[in-house]
Swiss-Prot record:
Protein name: Serine/threonine-protein phosphatase 2A activator 2
Keywords attached to this entry: Cytoplasm, Isomerase, Rotamase
Bias (Polar residues): 1-12
Compositional bias segments (type: Basic and acidic residues): 18-28, 361-377
Gene label: rrd2
Organism from which the protein derives: Aspergillus fumigatus (strain ATCC MYA-4609 / CBS 101355 / FGSC A1100 / Af293)
Major subcellular site: cytoplasm
Pro residues composition bias: residue spans: 38-52
Molecular function as annotated in GO: peptidyl-prolyl cis-trans isomerase activity; protein tyrosine phosphatase activator activity
Length: 422
């Protein structure tokens, strides 16, 4: 029997919907279906193996080897996976309980200075390749391809003349990770996979004994922060689209590591609690010392809507955690599950001689066509055509950085940002 209109669940005329309640229900639903379970133990940092003996080493050009779900599962059980986790977590552990300013008077080692010089050289190239006027478009600016090509053209020279590598094959292998840390030339996007490429560039240099464990705090506080600032400049200049964005339900449209490194810094802090991210005064006073606070400050500054509750509900939810140790553990779980554990991200991971693939993993016969065939982890690989719709076949997602920048252009200055439903 069809229900009568009297028994339908539609609200009576004039009844005001409680949208905040709906949002809370949606949050609870999303939390129950995504993210690591709080009952999962915090991942431990695997021992970092000593760098290999490279005296008779043969270098190879990095290629993609994760072509299927089986390849991904093989990677997750491999020594390279353990090395990546160990290196990343060791960096995070090296800054636990330390402020960025703790190292401000410490001189950088010669190799750290060389790495910083390369990042600064790329920053200067951004100024030489201004964005193309797209009439207010918030999608990726094609001028990024000019920057990418310029970096690719000079990359080998930098590794020879600045970094100090002399072996041509070693330069080809190591430099591949740096150029692919800027974003996708084809898709005009940037995400945690590109950020991971930057860390793999550093890991390769560590495997070549150009970075020591003693350098790890400086890697986070100087090298990584300079890279992140470079990428903010790139995002503001070229409006790169967020690769594989989760929208408001993601931690951040572009970066993950600021939250891992930043949470480690704040473990056992005497007065900055997780809820402090809602206090503008704390962000302004402490943001230059703590990466987590700086990233929250940045995210809030580029959004068109005011308030973490509306534009970053995941960060808002995390702020309710008991302490920073809980958040640090959660970030380690997320790195394993949401970065290394995601096939759409890891199918772009590059394997060479320093970060070797398991011999059983797939191989492409034509590396030039790597972007044309991809898999979502459902066993159905398919082609991506020239008129693709962003990363992994979702609809194209405009740059959130661009949205804020274009709004400020229209209204002038920073302006007041609207609160949803207000």
């Amino acid at each position: 029997m069809m229900p009568s209109h009297a028994t339908m669940s539609s609200p009576p005329a004039g009844t005001k919907l409680d949208l905040s309640k709906k949002l809370s229900e949606l949050r609870a639903s999303r939390r129950s279906h995504s993210g690591p379970s709080p009952r999962e133990p915090t991942p431990v940092t695997p021992p970092l193996p000593s760098p290999p003996d490279l005296s008779t080493h043969t270098y190879t050009r990095p290629v993609r080897r994760i072509l299927s779900r089986k390849d991904h599962e093989t990677f997750l059980a491999s020594s390279t996976y353990t090395l990546v986790v160990s290196f990343t977590f060791s960096l995070s552990d090296s800054v636990r309980g330390r402020a960025v300013t703790d190292n401000k008077d410490q001189p950088a080692s010669p190799n750290i200075s060389r790495i910083l010089s390369v990042i600064d050289t790329i920053r200067q190239l951004v100024d030489k390749h201004p964005s193309i006027d797209q009439g207010g478009s918030r999608f990726g600016n094609p001028a990024f391809r000019d920057l990418f090509d310029d970096v690719a053209a000079q990359n080998a020279t930098w590794h020879r003349e600045i970094i100090g590598l002399q072996n041509a094959d070693a330069i080809e292998e190591v430099s591949s990770y740096l150029v692919h840390s800027l974003g996708s030339r084809d898709r005009l996007d940037y995400g945690s996979g590109h950020e991971l490429n930057f860390m793999m560039w550093l890991l390769c240099l560590r495997q070549m004994q150009m970075i020591s464990t003693a350098d790890f705090p400086m890697i986070v506080f100087r090298v990584y922060l300079e890279y992140m600032r470079l990428m903010r400049q790139v995002q503001m200049t070229y409006y790169l689209e967020p690769a594989g964005s989760h929208g408001v339900w993601g931690l951040d449209d572009y970066h993950f590591l600021p939250f891992l490194f930043g949470a480690a810094q704040l473990v056992d802090h005497p007065y900055i609690t997780p809820l402090a991210i809602h206090n503008t005064a704390v962000l302004d006073e402490e943001g230059d010392k703590y990466i987590y606070l700086d990233q929250v400050r940045w995210v809030d500054s580029v959004k068109t809507v005011k308030g973490l509750r509306w534009h970053s509900p995941m960060l808002d939810d995390i702020s309710g955690a008991k302490n920073w140790l809980k958040i640090e553990g959660g970030m380690k779980k997320m790195f394993i599950k949401e970065v290394l554990g995601k096939l759409p991200i890891m199918q772009h991971f590059l394997f060479g001689s320093l970060l070797p693939a398991d011999p059983s993993m797939g191989e492409r016969s034509d590396d030039a066509q790597e972007d044309d065939l991809h898999d979502h982890g459902n066993g159905n690989p398919h082609a991506r055509h020239t008129d693709h719709f962003g990363d992994c076949c979702g609809i194209k997602v405009p740059s959130t950085v661009a949205a804020g920048a274009e709004m400020r252009k229209r209204i002038g200055g920073t302006g007041l940002r609207p609160i949803p439903f207000d």
